[in-house]
Amino acid sequence: MTLSQEKINNMAACLPVVGLLLLVAALPFHYGCAQRFALYWLAVTYPLDYVLNHRWSHWHWTPAKWIYVAFIAFFCLVPVWQLFDPIRTPLFDFTIEQYAPFLAVGLCGIAGITDKFQIDYAAWTMLGVSTAIVICLIVRTGLHHPDFAHWVLCFNINRAEHINTHMVVNLYFNLSLILGIFVVLYEKRSVIVRIITALYMVPSIFALLITEGRTGLLTFLLCTFVFLLHYMLVRRRWWMLSVVAAFVVLAGGIIMNNERLELIGKTTNPRIYIWKVAVETIMEKPVLGYGVCSAREEFVRRGLADKEFNEHYADYVRTFPKYTAQGRVHFEIMHPHNALLETWMQFGVFGVFLLVICLILPSLMRLGKYQLFLDLCILAFVMQACFESLGNNLQPMYLCLMVLLFQNQYQSDVYLQKLKRQASEHPVAEITPTA
């Protein structure tokens, strides 16, 4: 291979990395041109890299790739069930687009991606975007407020208006912190880089502590507790028992003094009535489900006939300008606020089985030092899935991308170790120069 060919191949290998970083940077914002551009970029550069660098030459099947088969199978439920769905609404096209990561990442995961991508690239990108979001919100909110509580309220309102819902942004913050911890503890970087990475984590922690989203805050506390507990037990750092105990006390104080969490015992969560209607809908067709479009139609029909559902959910939709246009109320935006229930409504027990497989298999991949952090990412996603539906404020790309990045990083490490071992066992013979 000539020097120019090598440069071209290296450039081709780096182009998908640019697309992945653009995609990672665009995730906390509303789905639009930024994410689409990143996906189009990957659609062009991924096959270019795959062909020029002969990625197939090192391909081999591993048990870890079964997760990508599950991703593809889960995506295929959408078009297959539509064949038997008597109606088709714009929700079908929306669902296809939102579930596309299961198909795209599934295919890329099986085939393999560029070895140029590193977890710390994603970590720094996510932490940088998170820091920029928090700084922009602080500037927009200003400092002239009567008290801190009012400032926090304005901060969260600005985030909802200019960035995205608390469910989307808080999950992004939590995942960025998980990747940041990995870089600080395990990446072979200088002390300065680790300190800077740790400092970049502070804005995300601050935003999670003042968020109005209970799920985001509880996810942050739970993931931190699991990490500390795992580090203490697996690494046998028994001195950390005092750290874990102190964190439990601190977390308890945060929970007890959070206004939104205090409301749990005083008010009824609207999701209780939403889930009740969802379960009633499921019980009509528990085995096969309705399909994407019919499931939503039946859910909305039953909900509008339910007094408590109307009082705690539908009335909010009726009065919110975002959901009223062209002289009618867009009730079709109402959803079960639970990924498992919505999947069950749509695809029956087949969908539930595949969704559970997609959430369990990543924890069985045996990725060495990467496994704990992938498990924490899955835990954060599952926490969100308990209170949100896939494709609404719970983007499948979060799950698919984390699985792909950690598994690819692990495979790259294994391959490099294999090359080093072969080099040590079979040293290159001295080459006699020729005239």
Spans of features found by a protein language model:
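Transmembrane signal-anchor hairpin modules in multi-pass inner-membrane enzymes, especially those
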Residues: 1-90, 117-120, 124, 187-195, ...
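Membrane-interface alpha helices of multi-pass inner-membrane proteins
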Residues: 21-28, 197-212, 380-386
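Transmembrane alpha-helices of multi-pass inner-membrane enzymes
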Residues: 41-46, 355, 374-386, 390-430, ...
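Aromatic-anchored transmembrane helix interface
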Residues: 66-73, 88-112, 123-130, 134, ...
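Alpha-helical transmembrane segments of multi-pass inner-membrane proteins
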Residues: 120-152, 163-232, 252-256, 402, ...
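A membrane-periplasm/extracellular boundary helix in multi-pass inner-membrane enzymes
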Residues: 206, 211, 231-269, 275-284, ...
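Interfacial juxtamembrane loops and adjacent helix segments
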Residues: 294-339, 343-345
